[in-house]
Swiss-Prot record:
This is Matrix protein 1. The lineage of its organism: Viruses, Riboviria, Orthornavirae, Negarnaviricota, Polyploviricotina. GO terms for cellular component: host cell nucleus; membrane; virion membrane. One of its GO terms (biological process) is viral budding from plasma membrane. Keywords: Host nucleus, Membrane, RNA-binding, Viral matrix protein, Virion. It comes from Influenza A virus (strain A/Duck/Hokkaido/8/1980 H3N8). It comes from the Viruses. Residues 165-252 are annotated as: RNP-binding. Homodimer and homomultimer. Interacts with NEP. Binds ribonucleocapsid by both interacting with genomic RNA and NP protein. May interact with HA and NA. Cannot bind NP without genomic RNA. Residues 1-164 are annotated as: Membrane-binding.
Length: 252
């Protein structure tokens, strides 16, 4: 796997699923391929994106700045600086300085990533902030190692909390989670169906599912009533795709 492919993988792992993720993936691909060279416009676009946490925006801004060639005197962006200040905690800053000194001795992406993984997310963010604010310099490869270590830690904690939600025995949370998944699946079906005539059926199924979820939320239903809702929808979607000549082996 190439270095940039690895960086893209790690960075996208912390972006929530949805149309915005697809857009960010496209921007990263363009940047890494050297197709997007307007850092100013890129940062302005990133700053105004909804949903993303300040830290995720900070990490993306850092990656764009590392990759897109820019004039020497280009102003650093406040939204990135604020996200990469380790919550203003002096302990994070102290650790970030120690980490920075170690990173200066590293020359490879994997070496830097290994060193960085033993630090907290706050210290890692602060260290990125040091480099972003030009208080320190490391090679691009080492900086990418730092980025990927940070993303790995964030993705780990997201995965833990997601697993807790999925395996929770609380029926109300499971019920709500199934309804949310059914609703987003229905939304995806509507987007995929487009405007062809054969799509009317898929649109109808999706629309009914969303109305059903709305009704279930409005009147309050037994927690087990949502079981299988998303799977039913996915079966419908696969049947529709088969008729359209699209064969997707895995959608679950």
């Amino acid at each position: 796997m190439s270095l940039l492919t690895e960086v893209e993988t790690y960075v996208l792992s912390i972006v929530p699923s949805g149309p915005l993720k697809a857009e960010i993936a496209q921007r990263l691909e363009d940047v890494f391929a050297g197709k997007n060279t307007d850092l100013e416009a890129l940062m302005e676009w990133l700053k105004t994106r909804p949903i993303l946490s300040p830290l995720t925006k900070g990490i993306l801004g850092f990656v764009f700045t590392l990759t897109v060639p820019s004039e020497r005197g280009l102003q650093r962006r406040r939204f990135v600086q604020n996200a990469l200040n380790g919550n203003g905690d002096p302990n994070n800053m102290d650790r970030a300085v120690k980490l920075y000194r170690k990173l200066k001795r590293e020359i490879t992406f994997h070496g830097a990533k290994e060193v960085a993984l033993s630090y907290s997310t706050g210290a890692l963010a602060s260290c990125m902030g040091l480099i972003y604010n030009r208080m320190g310099t490391v090679t691009t490869e080492v900086a990418f190692g730092l980025v990927c270590a940070t993303c790995e830690q964030i993705a780990d904690s997201q995965h833990r909390s997601h697993r807790q939600m999925v395996t929770t025995t609380n029926p109300l949370i499971r019920h709500e989670n199934r309804m949310v998944l059914a609703s987003t699946t229905a939304k995806a079906m509507e987007q995929m169906a487009g405007s062809s005539e054969q799509a009317a059926e898929a649109m109808e199924v999706a629309s009914q599912a969303r109305q059903m979820v709305q009704a279930m939320r409005t009147i309050g239903t037994h927690p087990s009533s949502s079981a299988g809702l998303k799977d039913d929808l996915l079966e419908n979607l696969q049947a529709y795709q088969k008729r359209m000549g699209v064969q997707m082996q895995r959608f679950k």
